[in-house]
Amino acid sequence: MFHNTFQSGLLSVLYSIGSKPLQIWDTQIKNGHVKRITDEEIQSLVLEIMGNNISTAFISCPVDPEKTLGIKLPFFVMVVKNMNKYFSFEVQIIDDKKIKRRFRASNYQSATRVKPFICTMPMRMDEGWNQIQFNLSDFVKRAYGTNYVETLRIQIHANCRIRRVYFADRLYTEDELPAEFKLYLPIRGQLSTQSPAFAMTSE
């Protein structure tokens, strides 16, 4: 999708305020919903994904399972709200050995598990709105000893509210971000920054 796009800085793949936030996303929902609502805390439109079973309620990008994103930027960032329910997301990448690997982070897992084609890890979230930062290059190297080449697919499961999902060439401070990438929290004033925990355990 983005193979022929010049990639630097910030590359947004979902923005809840946009005219068609799910234009490049496929929606799979059973016993749940994906809808745009106004979040009372930030008084702004957000995308809510809710479902009784997280495995049957998710959005994925790109829409066509045969196509890939082709995003080379190494930082994956999501601005999401903790709904105090099970929540997970998955990023599929390809490394310099031409092997596809999946990284799945969830708030209901306690240990990191690395298998040849999938790495699952726990993720802690604060109350309210969180900024989840995922250094794909670092995780690929630590889990598999290979180098990150590009991201192929993203899947975001219930249960959460999403403000924005984007890729970046590096981590940006709040002051460096363009205004439309910032989330203004009237109550706390500061967005909680999280990263999936990569703590290896021997099993």
Swiss-Prot record:
Its main location: nucleus. InterPro entries: CFA20/CFAP20DC, CFA20_dom. It comes from the Eukaryota. Disulfide bonds: none annotated. Keywords: Cell projection, Cilium, Cytoplasm, Cytoskeleton, Microtubule, Nucleus. GO terms for biological process: cilium assembly; positive regulation of cell motility; positive regulation of feeding behavior; regulation of cilium beat frequency involved in ciliary motility. Pfam families: CFA20_dom. It is found in: Nucleus; Cytoplasm, Cytoskeleton, Microtubule organizing center, Centrosome, Centriole; Cytoplasm, Cytoskeleton, Cilium basal body; Cytoplasm, Cytoskeleton, Cilium axoneme. One of its GO terms (cellular component) is ciliary basal body. Belongs to the CFAP20 family. Cilium- and flagellum-specific protein that plays a role in axonemal structure organization and motility. Microtubule inner protein (MIP) part of the dynein-decorated doublet microtubules (DMTs) in cilia axoneme, which is required for motile cilia beating. Involved in the regulation of the size and morphology of cilia. Required for axonemal microtubules polyglutamylation. This is Cilia- and flagella-associated protein 20.
